[in-house]
Design a protein with these regions (language model features):
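Short, conserved beta-strand element in jelly-roll/cupin
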Residues: 58-62, 74-94, 137-138
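A short, N-terminal "cap"/entry segment at the start of jelly-roll beta-barrel domains
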Residues: 1-53, 146-174
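Conserved short histidine dyad/triad with adjacent acidic residue
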Residues: 39-42, 57-74, 119
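Short acidic-glycine-tyrosine-enriched beta hairpin
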Residues: 95-116
């Protein structure tokens, strides 16, 4: 192979992560700061290959686990692609209008989208089987992450500080 060909191959290889070969010890255990009973194993694959405007994470959810405190984003799109789902893996959704939380069964190959501002809080839960998925979304300079079951909002400023606000203290204007 020529020197130019070797450089191209090295460049392409720097942009490839072989997720099927990732062992659990390659993934970080992410414990949710708003609800420590929620956690997932995660690798920021988008960061690893140099993405700056889109976040993409490879995630494994062990049996008997909830991935995150149910949430929705005001300014950021969020999506998930189910790589491998066992028989008892679920999308959890919380509808603020009805204040109900529902379980939606997941299957391998499902694609889920949560457009910015859609007031459907979401997360994943497993039973006896594990769940493997890609999770991603836009990286806006400002976002508000709503946690309806906890009664809090996290105001995210990617260029500065974040603020956690209890819903009871939120006053809308306009």
């Amino acid at each position: 192979m020529s020197e130019q060909g070797q450089l191209h191959a090295a460049s392409v290889n720097a942009n490839v992560i072989h997720t099927p070969s990732l062992a659990d010890n390659n993934l970080r255990n992410i414990i949710h700061p708003r609800d420590p009973t929620c956690s997932r194993l995660q690798l920021p694959v988008g960061d690893k290959v140099g993405l700056t405007k889109t976040g993409v994470h490879y995630c494994r959810l062990p049996p008997g686990t909830t991935s995150t405190a149910l949430h929705w984003h005001s300014h950021e799109d969020e999506w998930a692609y189910i790589v491998d789902a066992g028989r008892d893996c679920f999308l959890l959704t919380h509808d603020e209008g009805t204040n109900e939380t529902k379980e939606v069964p997941l299957t391998t190959g499902d694609f889920l989208a949560f457009p910015a501002g859609t007031k459907v809080a979401h997360g994943f839960r497993t039973g006896k089987d594990s769940l493997v998925y890609l999770m991603g979304g836009s990286r806006e300079s400002m976002d508000i992450c709503h946690y309806p079951e906890i009664g809090q909002r996290l105001i995210i400023d990617r260029n500065g500080e974040n603020w956690l606000v209890d819903e009871q203290h939120v006053k809308t204007q306009g």
